[in-house]
């Protein structure tokens, strides 16, 4: 395989999809050496088959707002690869959603799901609809219209969606209800459901908790842990909230959180009481993070910025893709950051990743570090299939074990000659090899 040529061909065939190209380039650049040890892969044109989605559904979603106006949005579902299990990946509702972003997310999801060792393929879906500022009734009407198109393409053994940015328990509940009405069946077609619908305990917490479990495994390699360490967290949604919760539980100090308007810096630290305030502000009142600075004296609020210029020991990007650029990464290194562990999907640009790796700090890519969410989704699928529910303690122990195993796989495939662990390479090669072998065993499809 010539990675540069493969990428050039993809850019020619699928122009104007920069996020998708970025995700493919990151994977190809790290697996090329391992791939070329297997000439049978080239003979089967494996890399091209793996880079291009199995299928993409694109559709119009028409709904009526509270004023009686007819609104139109675009809906998508990218079914990327099902070599090791049914398509699995979230649904995102955000104004920025487009096909390029969803193709990148589905591509990443394929390898992330492979790393968990659970039988799940990769997919992703969503819409450019934003729930922000919409009434509960408007969100319900949109979701029901969205499901009128999507329902026939999903199912417990075909494609199992979940939540993502803009899609929480409320939206998953509406989707599940509409699917049940249309399909005439009560099955585990969605994960991230409420407990009353067959959802799993620890699922809301899983991505954030899993990120910290992975971080702890990395820190162990340096003979340390989180006690007394200061952390920068971006975002203030589900992932950021439970990342912060687990940091506090492990003895760390959270200095920042953010939203799309700006970030807060609390030199005293965001403690349990303050985190509860943020959870209530965001989950119940759907407020803005600046209100935290109005609530607590001594807190700095920076409009229109991200927290990466602040001094801390650890950075935990938990908001969105490409939120840390090369300049941000240089600031983090200059300020003494020893570890970056990604709760969001691809939050660091290629330039930022290069800075982290050249500085030889601990850097965990999202496909490894944030695999906790989809891991517990997989455990939810298992519980649904056997018609049983596990305790929170059981699920949490399984999550810890999965994250530890992912870390071990990254170390196995990513340790370089000088002993530095390239977690990007390790995650990509480990995830790729399982999918590649499964595809080869199934013939040319």
Identify what each model region corresponds to.
Residues 1-23, 218, 318, 333-445:
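Adenosine-phosphate binding glycine-rich loop
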Residues 262-363, 368:
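Rossmann-like adenosine-cofactor binding region
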Residues 40-71:
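Structured beta-strand/loop patches that form or line metal/cofactor-binding pockets in enzymes
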Residues 94, 113-227:
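Glycine/serine-rich phosphate-binding loop and adjoining beta1-alpha1 elements at the start
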Residues 59-120, 124, 128:
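Phosphate-interaction motifs
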Residues 194, 198-311:
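Glycine-rich phosphate/diphosphate-binding loop of Rossmann-like nucleotide-binding domains
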Residues 21, 37-44, 117, 154-163, ...:
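Flexible, glycine/charged-enriched surface loops at secondary-structure junctions
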């Amino acid at each position: 395989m010539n990675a540069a040529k493969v990428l050039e061909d993809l850019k020619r065939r699928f122009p104007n999809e920069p996020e998708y190209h970025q995700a493919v380039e990151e994977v190809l650049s790290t697996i090329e050496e391992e791939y070329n040890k297997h000439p049978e892969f080239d003979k089967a044109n494996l890399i091209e088959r793996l880079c291009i989605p199995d299928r993409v559904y694109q559709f119009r979603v028409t709904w009526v707002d509270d004023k009686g106006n007819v609104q139109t949005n675009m809906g998508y579902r990218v079914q990327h690869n099902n070599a090791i299990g049914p398509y699995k990946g979230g649904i995102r509702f955000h104004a920025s959603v487009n096909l390029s972003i969803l193709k990148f997310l589905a591509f990443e999801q394929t390898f992330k799901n492979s790393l968990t060792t659970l039988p799940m393929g990769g997919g992703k879906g969503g819409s450019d609809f934003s729930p922000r500022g919409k009434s509960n009734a408007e969100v319900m009407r949109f979701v029901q219209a969205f499901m009128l198109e999507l329902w026939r393409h999903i199912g417990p053994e075909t494609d199992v969606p979940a939540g993502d940015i803009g899609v929480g328990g409320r939206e998953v509940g509406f989707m599940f209800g509409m699917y049940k009405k249309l399909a005439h069946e009560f099955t585990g077609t969605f994960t991230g459901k409420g407990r009353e619908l067959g959802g799993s305990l620890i699922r809301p917490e899983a991505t954030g908790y899993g990120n910290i479990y992975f971080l702890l495994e990395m820190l162990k390699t340096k003979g340390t842990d989180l006690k007394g360490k200061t952390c920068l967290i971006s975002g203030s949604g589900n992932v950021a909230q439970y990342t912060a919760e687990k940091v506090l539980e492990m003895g760390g100090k959270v200095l920042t959180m953010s939203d799309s308007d700006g970030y807060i810096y609390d030199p005293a630290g965001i403690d349990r009481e303050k985190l509860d305030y943020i959870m209530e502000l965001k989950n119940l009142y759907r407020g803005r993070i600046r209100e935290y600075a109005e609530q607590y004296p001594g807190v700095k609020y920076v409009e229109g910025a991200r927290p990466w210029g602040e001094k801390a020991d650890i950075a935990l990007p938990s908001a969105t893709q490409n939120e840390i650029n090369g300049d941000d990464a240089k600031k983090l290194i200059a300020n003494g950051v020893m570890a970056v562990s990604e709760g969001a999907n691809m939050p660091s640009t290629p330039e930022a990743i290069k800075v982290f790796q050249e500085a030889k700090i601990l850097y965990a890519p999202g496909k490894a570090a944030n695999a906790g969410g989809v891991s517990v989704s997989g455990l939810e699928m298992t519980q649904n299939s056997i018609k049983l529910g596990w305790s929170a303690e059981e699920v949490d122990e399984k999550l810890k074990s999965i994250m530890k195993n992912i870390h071990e796989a990254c170390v196995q495939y990513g340790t370089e000659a000088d002993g530095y662990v390239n977690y990007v390479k390790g995650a990509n090669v480990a995830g790729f090899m399982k999918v590649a072998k499964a595809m080869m065993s199934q013939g040319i499809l």
